[in-house]
């Protein structure tokens, strides 16, 4: 069976070697037919602590690393929008 690969946004990078990735999907409401956004958070392994909050990343399913971590970050899809810029004042 192939490994699942998902794309999501890093919402937390506070723990060591771990990031929390929020993956959104769109589903159709069974009765009303409206398209609704559903989301789920995954704990993913980040060996080098390279990924920061706000970045869009690709995660891959792996064998369990810890109680919560069964995903690892493969690569960065898009840089975060909240990057700090230094200014001379």
UniProtKB/Swiss-Prot annotation:
GO CC annotation terms, alphabetical: cytosolic small ribosomal subunit
Entry-linked SUPFAM superfamilies: Nucleic acid-binding proteins (SSF50249)
Keyword rRNA-binding: yes
Entry's Gene Ontology molecular function annotations: rRNA binding; structural constituent of ribosome
Record's keyword terms, sorted: Ribonucleoprotein, Ribosomal protein, RNA-binding, rRNA-binding
Gene3D superfamilies: Nucleic acid-binding proteins (2.40.50.140)
One GO term (biological process): translation
Signal peptide: none
Sections of the chain in a coiled coil: none
Stored CDD domains: Ribosomal_uS17
InterPro entries, sorted: NA-bd_OB-fold, Ribosomal_uS17, Ribosomal_uS17_bact/chlr
HAMAP family assigned to the protein according to its UniProt record, in alphabetical order: Ribosomal_uS17_B
Binding partners and assembly: Part of the 30S ribosomal subunit.
Cited PANTHER family: 40S RIBOSOMAL PROTEIN S11 FAMILY MEMBER (PTHR10744), SMALL RIBOSOMAL SUBUNIT PROTEIN US17M (PTHR10744:SF1)
Protein name, UniProt field: Small ribosomal subunit protein uS17
Lineage: Bacteria, Pseudomonadati, Pseudomonadota, Alphaproteobacteria, Sphingomonadales
């Amino acid at each position: 069976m192939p490994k699942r690969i998902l794309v999501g946004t890093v919402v937390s990078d506070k723990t060591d070697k771990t990031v929390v990735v929020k993956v959104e999907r769109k589903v159709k409401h069974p009765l009303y037919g409206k398209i609704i956004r559903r989301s789920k958070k995954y704990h993913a392994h980040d060996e080098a602590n390279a990924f920061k909050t706000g970045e869009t990343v690709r995660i891959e399913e792996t064998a369990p690393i810890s109680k919560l971590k069964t995903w690892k970050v493969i690569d960065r899809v898009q840089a975060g929008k909240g990057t700090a810029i230094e200014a001379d004042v």
